Amino acid sequence: MHRYRTHTCGALRDSDIDQTVRVSGWCHRIRDHGGLLFIDLRDHYGLTQCVADPDSPAFKDAEKLRAEWVVRIDGRVRRRPEGTDNDDLPTGKVEIFITEIEVLGPAGELPLPVFGEQDYPEDVRLRYRFLDLRREKLHQNIMTRGAIVDAMRKRMKEQGFFEFQTPILTASSPEGARDFLVPSRIHPGKFYALPQAPQQYKQLLMMSGFDRYFQIAPCFRDEDPRADRLPGEFYQLDVEMSFVTQDDVFAAMEPVITGVFEDFAKGKPVTKSWPRIPYFESLRKYGTDKPDLRNPLEMQDVSEHFRGSGFKVFARMLEEERNQVWAIPGPGGGSRAFCDRMNSWAQGEGQPGLGYIMWREGNEGAGPLANNIGPERTEAIRVALGLKAGDAAFFVAGDPAKFVKFAGLARTKVGEELNLIDKDQFALAWVVDFPMYEYNEDDKKVDFSHNPFSMPQGGMDALTSQDPLTIKAFQYDITCNGYEIASGGIRNHRPEAMVKAFEIAGYGEQEVIDRFGGMYRAFQYGAPPHGGMAAGVDRIVMLLCGTNNLREISLFPMNQRAEDLLMGAPSQVAPKQLRELHIRLNLPES
């Protein structure tokens, strides 16, 4: 017999009755039923009920066991007594009558229970992550994550992609966030950086004659904590292809992402044919470049109906050309109580309020706005929005660049409050035609809007003749249920265009050469047109596991202060290590 087990804790069935077996695992739960001791033994594969009675030679040993002790149990498989089957367990028709117990690893008093799914403070869960990971839901999430990554690899290979690994130690580059720096012992005063993404390497692979690359890549960014991103590191499905247009990338990646979602959607519908939504259209209709298309509401510009109207607040705003009035339809929301609730919510968001119109029987408009603009304009708005009696509309006004985020929040709030959002689906879409540049108010300069290596639509002509803020890029995102799950673009593969693109953002030619020397040199020796994308593994897993917290799908995450409470990182290091790296600490005063 094997030293530790003949079967796993999830393997025993009716066919094993009367066999002598050996199992090992953790004492998940111990119950004393009037002299009978029941031990639910758990391992990675499942749960098996084990029983000892006072006549069992192992009864005294069984009485000593406590939760999460690791034990080896020998015994005979028998049918559970009639009426005690557990249909929720694959092993639920049988039990082991214990003949021998060996304690392999006792456990101290538990700082958090493994049995059950009670909420515990995050710092306790992270400090004792090895216990937390034993809990069923988190354990299953991690297994699902592994299966999703396997499915990604399988589907990428079916599409003709090859997996390569790019370096982890690289040069620092301005890709939008701070780098994690690694000092060089051999070259004092110089630093490596952990890659924010394999961006340059994957483009260099295309210039090296490879085609259709992918990897499940670790990425590192020294960013301030954010609710939707884990501190420190994350993983992405990184992709690059040679001799492709934007449509080629879409044709290759839609089946991969759709297929992965279908594999793990548990029967929920997944978008088959993805809509392509231009960036500015997405902002106008949904108030965000990450639209949740499960919400059917689309905002409309209704400025013409308020221009010169009796509602002076909006009418005066519209005298400035940049200002607009947007309407958010609220089908079924035409009650005073709901409209007042939305108005109070808006005030809680720091807004002066949320204007509204309700439509009553006969499509008569009601509310302060309707009274001020009159029945003709009110009816025109109703028709434009496709509303009817019992519906409402809500209005935001001003400079869209300033109110668009709030408008998007209001659209989401209306959809949630009126139960219009179908939570049982995965709504995927492409968002396309991103602006190449944006104006950085803090630095008072034009800056890259997204990826600095994207090809501008119009190429070199656009860079030399257009207002930079009007240039669009061959850049695209994949969105799902209000999350950005992937981003990519067709790359700028001409050296003169690369230099010009960076020049507009304030980088001199020599600085470009210094920072991106490897890629700049490669551009001089025959660079193919190429493009690709990167999909966020963590966010995709989060969506498919049905959680809103990235820590629920990650093995050993840091907390929001970028601390690893289990391993004690970041930590001080020995003075000898600092001397070897020629580093002297200059700490801020506390």
UniProtKB/Swiss-Prot annotation:
Pfam families: GAD, tRNA-synt_2, tRNA_anti-codon
Catalytic activity, reaction form: tRNA(Asx) + L-aspartate + ATP = L-aspartyl-tRNA(Asx) + AMP + diphosphate
One GO CC term on file: cytoplasm
E.C. number: 6.1.1.23
GO BP of this protein: aspartyl-tRNA aminoacylation
Region forming the signal peptide: none
Residues that bind L-aspartate: 175, 221, 450, 491
PROSITE patterns listed in its UniProt record: AA_TRNA_LIGASE_II (PS50862)
Gene Ontology molecular functions: aspartate-tRNA ligase activity; aspartate-tRNA(Asn) ligase activity; ATP binding; nucleic acid binding
First-listed, main subcellular location of the protein, grouped into a coarse class: cytoplasm
Site residues by UniProt (Important for tRNA non-discrimination): 33, 83
Function summary: Aspartyl-tRNA synthetase with relaxed tRNA specificity since it is able to aspartylate not only its cognate tRNA(Asp) but also tRNA(Asn). Reaction proceeds in two steps: L-aspartate is first activated by ATP to form Asp-AMP and then transferred to the acceptor end of tRNA(Asp/Asn).
Family in the record: Belongs to the class-II aminoacyl-tRNA synthetase family. Type 1 subfamily.
Protein name in the entry: Aspartate--tRNA(Asp/Asn) ligase
Species whose genome carries this gene: Rhodopseudomonas palustris (strain HaA2)
Taxonomy of the source species: Bacteria, Pseudomonadati, Pseudomonadota, Alphaproteobacteria, Hyphomicrobiales
